[in-house]
Amino acid sequence: MPDRVTRIALDVDGTLSGYGGIIDKWTIGEFLKTAHVGIVSTRGDCHNVASEFGLGYACCAGVDKPTKADCLRDYAQKYPVNGGSLYIADTPHDFTQALNAGWNFADANHLRLNLGAGGDIHTGVVNIDARLLPNIDIVRDLEKDPIPFPDGTVQFIVMKDFLEHLSWRKVAGFMKQVYNKLKSGGWVFIQSPDMDAIYHSIIEKRDFHGDFKYRFETISYWVGGGQDYPENTHKAFFTIDTIHELLKDIGFSQTYCRNDNTNFQCIAKK
């Protein structure tokens, strides 16, 4: 557990939790919105001021309050949320760092799965992929074979750049399987290409990333996948609205989705 991540004991009845992501890009409004899903995670600085959720809260340590802990307590008192635990990180984390730090600190005994892991390996998580790669725990083609764990036993499932590689005809059934594998109160994280954002970029002739020029290879890559090995082809396509509707139809009790450049990110709680 990194020393820079510290649990803050809140002096309020209800504790607060949230998903940090790349902290300096997440507003307080987004942070609070994800807290309703009950995700243990991180929040780092005093510059995340939101208007889109009508909160408009800012607290800078040493200015508005003596310490960062005082800021967080004040925030929790003003916006109480039924959730898990609140964490603070002095150094911004990327998504996977925040995710792993929060969950490892909260309860290392939870069964956690990383589906379609590829080279994105996490510790304390069962990493599953269709290919035999370094540090993959289970080799399984999840488009053909079921998730190899009993129903109701998994606390947390990550599907980062995975769902789009399944046939669109199988996505709904697969997500129902994911739902069934989760414990009550378990949750899933999904990252996938955001077709709405990609198509707007194409129409407006905007560059997708700083390291790409606007050309047919760029469009083909973001829509169709890398296609450098058989499994790396996109076969299902989503927008934030359609993935949100799918999760709702399957039965997830709470969902939150946001755009992240050419991708969307969703968290959903069973």
For the regions a language model picked out, list residue spans one by one:
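Conserved Lys-Pro-Asp/Glu-containing loop-to-beta segment of HAD-superfamily phosphomonoesterases
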Residues: K68-H93
